[in-house]
Amino acid sequence: MRLGVCFSLAAAASVARAALTATENDTSIVLENDRLRATFDKGRGSIIDLYLDGQDFLGPQSGSTGIGPYLDCYCTPSGFYTAGSTNPVTELVQGTDSTGTKYAGIILNDTYTPTGQEFQQYWFLRDGETGFHMFSRLAYYNETTPFLRNLQELRTLFRPNTDLWTHLTSSDLQTAPLPSDEAIAEQIVVQDATWRLNNTPDDAYYQQFSEYFTKYTFSNHWRDNDVHGLYADGSTSDGTTYGAWLVMNTKDTYYGGPLHSDLTVDGIIYNYIVSNHHGEGTPNITNGFDRTFGPQFYLFNGGGSSSLEELRDEARSLASPSWNADFYDSIAKHVIGYVPSSQRGSVKGTIKLPKNAKSPIAVLTVDGHYFQDNSAVPSSHQYWADIDKNGRFSIDRVVAGKYRLTVYADGIFGDFTRDGIVVKARKSTSIKETWKPESAGTEIWRLGTPDKSSGEFRHGAARDPTHPRHPPEYLIYWGAYDWQSDFPGGIDYMIGESDPATDFNTVHWAVFGPTPDNPVAESNTTHDWRIRFDLSAKQLHARKTATLTIQLAGAKAASGNTDVYNASEPYANLPLRSYINEQEEPLTMVIGYDQSSSCIVRSAVSCYQVREKWEFPASWLKEGSNLLRLSLPTNGTNYESAVLPTSVYVQYDALRLELK
């Protein structure tokens, strides 16, 4: 086997050692070492041929397939734009980095004439590696039109057109055979970008993974996602296996923090640099906007008989901000806006955590803003690190500046935040804090686990028992399940007796359906949910104030994932009303149009977080049986231009009742 499978972070991305060459003519640039050869089309602004050990990784060009990696966006007034489509100007740069390693880079410059938006895309190949270091830049300088629009999507794509690739993977749980050409030809569209494959029941994807295929099935949180890509098992390449991967070796120029989730791979390998698929905020493109994103690394490996897991592990071994940091410093002179090591510091901290805090994480984002809203400051950077059992964490290579520290953990309501964390270049900032969990008295009950996810409830993270790869149920497609069969009488949950995994749904619909198997939408049993609980005289004795906390892992108002207010929609801002016993006036949470997310309909159980706490008189409660009724608008729907469910909905993270 030509490749080792256990690589240290200091290891190169392959064992290639021959000198790198770069040749240019009027129409193309070719970058090549002894294993990897790439041809760049100067007129198109994209790589059009890519070979590893003589194996074609892209296949023939056909429209927008058989090319990549390349850059496009949804960011012009008319929508989509592919960098290089107007007047591509390319530059070839070459040099030797601080380690004595040769490199060559292609820089694409393109200006979208109607607005003056400037695009730059960078591809760098180092000698001894079989992949491309990628940076992307968007700039907008226009005093006449100081506000253009939001940067709704910015992404790079590796888009093959070949039967070489047999599997796609974004995690151990999200690994599957690619649907066959026959399955794709015979598929039935059931939702935007979602197919039913029951016309080809012998297809490997159908047999092993799911009856439904959607690009959203392979989306992931950025906290959990380091590498994703395609695998060739050798069945179409004479027994030789290959991999193509997007390695997220840095994440500091994305937005949304560790809870940002996005598409990864669906036959195309994406690097979704900016998007709002699951409701995350996106930056506005205003006069002076100038942002360089990256680096990330597209790795191409294989050439022997390595398994998918082995090739993926090789890619994952490179997913560290320290990998190739010296190289990035060497090429900073070529990359406008890249922040070199000389302008970065580090943070080390100790947090005394609440009892029973699980999977704690420390997050650094822009000062003064909720961490999921850091796109409000487009120039901001973001970092995070797991906190160990002793409460310690460390984060290196932090761009100098002022940050907010956020700490959260599974099992704990609320977050710890501290503004004003100053990071200085080439200095280490120390933090020592105590996180005192929020409390409004004695906890009477909680429903769900506060972990910023609705996955613990029915059809959430539970594994699908009907397919041998057993994907989590929420990843498959919401319409694969039937509300009327699961909850014929609606939700009637008894604290202390009911099981959250079966008796509480992962999503609270105002209206459920229609689905592929049931053309009738259900609203009578969906919009009102009942939670019953008993209280004793002892629990109520001398209590004056009760506090109800509701944390949502996601919610969809009429704005969906767009953050656009539409006055014609009655649920542009969505009310969730909580009624206590016989009280006629509810405790009302209003989910704003800019807090809405397309969560479960895009196969997610953790999106933009929304929470509310209410104090109310303890006299509203009584000894014996009590009722909390959670109510969404009856028949609450909105207009959808795409093939998506029209219902508004919420997804509960956790609820809690306290008394004092």
From Swiss-Prot:
Its EC number is 4.2.2.23. Gene3D superfamilies: 2.70.98.10, Carboxypeptidase-like, regulatory domain (2.60.40.1120), Galactose-binding domain-like (2.60.120.260). One of its GO terms (biological process) is cell wall organization. It is an enzyme of class 4 (lyase). Residues 446-466 are annotated as: Disordered. It holds the Pfam family CBM-like. Belongs to the polysaccharide lyase 4 family. This is Rhamnogalacturonate lyase B. It comes from Emericella nidulans (strain FGSC A4 / ATCC 38163 / CBS 112.46 / NRRL 194 / M139). The lineage of its organism: Eukaryota, Fungi, Dikarya, Ascomycota, Pezizomycotina.
